[in-house]
Amino acid sequence: MPNKTAMIKRNSDKRLTRAQVRVFQKNIYAYYDAHGRDLPWRRTRDPYRVIVSEIMLQQTQVERVIEKYTAFIKLFPDFLALSKAPLKKLLTVWQGLGYNRRALALKALAQKVIDGHGGKLPSDPAMLLALPGIGKYTAGAVAAFAFNKPVVFMDTNIRRVYIQAFFHDRADIHDDEIIPFLEQTMDVENPRKWYNALMDYGAMLKREQVNPNRRSAHYTKQSPFENSNRQVRGRILKILVKEAPLTQARIVKKTGMDPERIKKNLVQLVEEGFIKKKGRSFAL
């Protein structure tokens, strides 16, 4: 449980004293040293493995990623292997993670690293941002976890920690208000450990308290998966991985879903490069 006596009241000018920073860091590290998670991507400094884990973790629970990550790394151990991966093989190992666009983006990223960076992932967050599938958070996370750079970035767990610590009497809190606290409390000597500790502390807060993120101006609930287009697309791809080519009528029959929704999603999957249409049939 968090040490409530160590929670710091927010200064009106957003400036913290050195003592306040020390208390905050001590509280976070105390929890991490006792309860930090042993995750496979935390046992490596390989930038390739770090970026694979970060893309897998986008909008996906840690528990679901662990098994898939290990299998993925065995099949595609580096950027070169991933860049040459057949789409069918890639989507087969990706099944169960959802958001299949990430798999295509990761393959495209691997090709960019091979072609534009000599097979080595850049450490500069600005250069990382230029790669497929990489947003501001992922660029910062990769810079910190792979290269131990003291860059400022935020995810849902980190946001939760800072809202709970510094904004306990507030609602409708914007990330721009949180950033100054992130900057002041950064452990610049070991940002890798610091961010791991923040994330584990934030995950604990979600389990043991009313979620502080509900007071964030950016808080939204994830849309239900059941009967969503994500579910439709996932079923189509799962079928085509196992059996192809298939006509639209056969896909409708195998999924048992609405023909119009199948038609719409087939068109989108073709446009996005997931599948190909030849005549009346579809395949990877």
Each PLM stretch: what is its role?
Residues 8, 13, 17-21, 25-231, ...:
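Catalytic cores of DNA base-excision repair glycosylases
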Residues 266-267:
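Short, hydrophobic-biased segments on the C-terminal half of alpha helices
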Residues 270-282:
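A short, conserved structural fragment
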Residues 233-240:
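Hydrophobic residues on short alpha-helical segments
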